[in-house]
From Swiss-Prot:
The gene is frr. It comes from Pectobacterium atrosepticum (strain SCRI 1043 / ATCC BAA-672). InterPro entries: Ribosome_recyc_fac, Ribosome_recyc_fac_dom, RRF_sf. The keyword Signal does not apply. GO terms for molecular function: ribosomal large subunit binding. It holds the Pfam family RRF. This is Ribosome-recycling factor. It is found in: Cytoplasm. Belongs to the RRF family.
């Protein structure tokens, strides 16, 4: 019984950490990465479609992304969607390829981005702790129903606390890597 709750908590904590990593990967550093454009949706036949489904995005050099749109008629819509995003990018069309140069980040912008990343990290830690609280509540309910002993409940809570510490450490490591990446240039 407690093992199932522990495994469920571990799975949910892992999802929290992955969601945090995905969130910070979208934050633009000075380096070109196709994941920067993951959040962009293009108006395609009346519905917002992710850019990745309509085009191939590759890194051309350290500061430029190249986008090859599958349907040429969509190029203007893709350009418009990139300009409308809050990424501050200005794409330029060159035949069949749309090039997106990434401007270098200013020191002030880097510091702002680090604040954003730290806020995301705190949200990640909070969501991991919420999973811990849910698991501990389930253990307390089992204890109240006399399905487990006090010793088993204490042991299970200690296991979940170790899991929590482990996953929070993963969030902190990802945060440190992203901060280093932001301050690199």
């Amino acid at each position: 019984m407690t093992n199932e709750i522990r495994k469920d908590a571990e799975t949910r904590m892992d999802k929290c950490v992955e969601a945090f990593k995905n969130q910070i990967n979208r934050i633009r550093t000075g380096r070109a990465s196709p994941s920067i454009l993951d959040g962009i949706h293009v108006e395609y036949y009346g519905s917002a479609t992710p850019l990745r489904q309509l085009a191939n995005v590759v890194v051309e050099d350290s500061r430029t992304l190249a986008i090859s749109v599958f349907d040429r008629s969509l190029s203007p819509a893709v350009e418009k969607a990139i300009m409308a995003s809050d990424l501050g990018l200005n794409p330029s069309s060159a035949g069949t390829v749309i090039r997106v140069p990434l401007p270098p980040l200013t020191e002030e912008r880097r510091k702002d981005l680090i604040k954003v990343v730290r806020g995301e990290a705190e949200q990640g830690r909070i969501s991991v702790r919420n999973v811990r609280r849910d698991a501990n509540d389930k253990f307390k309910a089992l204890l109240k129903d006399k399905a487990i002993s006090e010793d088993e409940e204490r042991r299970a809570q200690d296991d979940v606390q170790k899991l929590t510490d482990n996953f929070i450490k993963k969030v902190d490591v990802a945060l440190a890597e992203k901060e280093a990446e932001l301050m690199e240039f």
